[in-house]
């Protein structure tokens, strides 16, 4: 969210560094409720006493539950294949071939036959909507499970409002939902199956976000989740990841909540009718049984929540959390594994295209201004969070945006404000019970309120979300120590060092009585999602930068003239001028001088930016305090990098040695 000067505010609460040293950028505190009823009471605010509070009569949907899904499908063979595919998805260990899947409702057909209804001619049987509910018959033939296929947003609205308590339409047309007791990700409950392949490929041990589980435990949880889903009406969505058509991933999401289905409809790339017809077997499947807990006495489980990833089976199982962001970030982790195997670099970054067609990547943690700076109306937005860099250029992984909503204001972030309309999912927001107007300043449920909407809702979005090879790689840091320059040009080794470090600084909340800035490091600016060792991603980044002529930059959006509490935050207009100078190529021909300790090259002048702020030492009145804070920050960088210092690619440590030499020098 923006502060008065327009930059994203610094987070002060609700985030903790985990025991293994990994900083989880968007995990959040538990919901502020003790019971489900209390949670629902927090969602809706009572209207003011002067506002009449009348209950409008409810009009039932005509035609019953199945009426929206009664149109045609012509290819009988293709439909049969789809039914077989659904059956395979819902197979479990005790039902290896999956439940029998038939068209229509066998119970309804039986009733019609008993009443002497004439049979329907075959020609008419084929006229059905592609989203018609398939009925999966359990082995015992005593239960029926509706499988709703690729519903539209309007149909998902109907399902959510009718069957999911806590689902409402807001005054702007968005769907307000509740994610239950979990209002943020649960990184400590994420597990990855460790087998012969992943034991060698993935990053394990200190600092890694990957917590192991075995195949047997995964199958136990998968069985539990699939059996639960088989007892319900489930929604199946088929979506795509990666706008690069040569490197797309086909994803199937099976969930029990329309909210989850609409969320993924917005966040993934929405296939055309032709792409759906030729969809075939998915590359990855998510089983979201988040309403049902895992057995916490199962091996490797530490709570009733578990997010399990099996890369060999290409499946993810979610239990015990209804927070939709687990699906988004789970798939991002999958892309962090699959794409590098194809020689494609996956990145946790924003990306835009300048007015002259040049592309820039923006890396940064919360509060650095990544969204603010990458969403520039002088250019086009390729994406705000997840990207791939291949030999074809850069491409957005997703088809939507997942924006924070706390303290959202129209005048500060009009693009996000205007995107909250019909089709958008609003998570855990509070609204007026009568008018349905959302109060974005109210965090009664959680501070981690979010909006998920298609990227087409942003006016400056570039569709398709692809671009040429980036010319600039911009690493953003909000330095609350006030010792990093507003902009520095980096050599390749420095780019790798600062990319692996993933530095920013947080300011402790005043309620704690602590005024000291707190350094935060998140490897590759997304430690919670990476699968391989950070040095592998850094090496791929350097290789592509060298191959395609990209330049690395370190941009400080934090403090100048003193640390937090003494100096002032660098003004947003100055930072925008710096970004403009990077886009235009002005800084490539500027004169540079080198700083102490970090050895950063800083320009002596930039058009529209006061020269006296370019070298931080000249903005401090207390030079001794500057030196003290500079050495302190350098020491924090050194300490953080110790966990990466011994890494070798094969038996060769030369790359790591080169990267280490680019760090602070005392």
Swiss-Prot record:
Residues 1-68, 91-132 are annotated as: Disordered. Signal peptide: none annotated. ATP binds at residues 364-371. GO terms for cellular component: cytosol. It catalyses: oxaloacetate + ATP = phosphoenolpyruvate + ADP + CO2. It comes from the Eukaryota. InterPro entries: PEP_carboxykinase_ATP, PEP_carboxykinase_C, PEP_carboxykinase_N, PEPCK_ATP_CS. Keywords: ATP-binding, Cytoplasm, Decarboxylase, Gluconeogenesis, Lyase, Nucleotide-binding. This is Phosphoenolpyruvate carboxykinase (ATP). It comes from Zea mays.
